[in-house]
Amino acid sequence: MCSARVTPDVVLLFDPQYWNYLHVARAVAPHALLITDISVFPAVFRLPWEYIVLAGSACPFATSLAHHDASCSPSHALPLPFVAPDLLASGGSVATSAWECARYLGATTIVYIGLDLAFPGARTHFRGALFEERAHLQSGRVAPAETTSFCALHSLPLYPVPAASDPHPGKNSPASPTGENKEQTVLTDARFSLYAVWLEAHLARYTHIKTYALEPAGRRVAGITPLRFSQLVTLLNRSAAVPHCRTMYSRRRRLYSRYRNSSVQVNCTDAVRWRRTMKSTPVHCLGHFTKKKKSAEGARNLWRALRRADTRCASPHNLEHALERTRSFLNAMPLTPTTYENKTHALYTALCTLLPTEPTYRARAHAHLFELLTRTLKFCAAYTEEEGEWREA
């Protein structure tokens, strides 16, 4: 896609296998948003993405990182820079993950392009795909590329299933080349059938989401309506969400600039002084901090100081409970374009509501407030210590 000058806006990658990483290893998409989890191949995070958003993971190792043992003391607890994110339902395929992500983001109309869940024309991959090119590179006189294609095609038993029918069959219809509206079949296997069953179950569950397949050439999936190019153009012109998306994309760069230049980059000295005195309320100090616009060096020093914050007066149970409450508070916020400063205001408000009312424990609660801030701020923004700047997560 990138070589054809088609720039993706969002890239989803949830498969932890090394071979799945190779699909994006050569991709150059500096303006794309990557949605992934921490169980993927590590080299994925070193690619030049504009933003990286972590979703929940069903992998046991990743789950143990996101929900570490709360019985250990804060000094030995794993210093995670984020709270446990939401888990997207996985159907085992990138097609099911894309549908689930679109549903999670609130989409009511989803259009699939290139979805087949079968082997139309006995083809295993699209032309120019990684595994097809790899088969040609490794082919020889006694092991041609067709051998690799045959093994991939017959790795599981094949059986015919009904093919997706064209909504308006005609002479130029790919589903009905003879002009007759008769049912055709395509070859599939148990793996693709599992993905199809997952889609059919979720389409029946979320009936308010309309799902289409553009010029389908694969198997028929109950709940997915075939769509032609002319119908897609009409659908896009009538969709009320298209102008809103165009407006959001045009504002993306300006919002990103506001995040980077936000006045929430506070001074480390003032923060440490507030932590030692514990005389000022969080709301008062927030107003004092946000009046100043500090440099990236101050933000770096603040980050290092907060990582060394003393949390011995806060029990691990209360800390984890407070983090969960804070995450619930932020997730309940409407998805509207806000600045990093607005999110930080909401974060401080949530943390202040968690402080105890007793004077004896309130002073000690101020001491671990910075620990909460340190571990929860990554939910709103990611900090790159090498570059010394804040950026949107």
UniProtKB/Swiss-Prot annotation:
Biased composition annotated in UniProt, kind: Polar residues: 173-183
Superkingdom field: Bacteria
Region (Disordered): 164-183
Listed name of the protein: Uncharacterized protein TP_0762
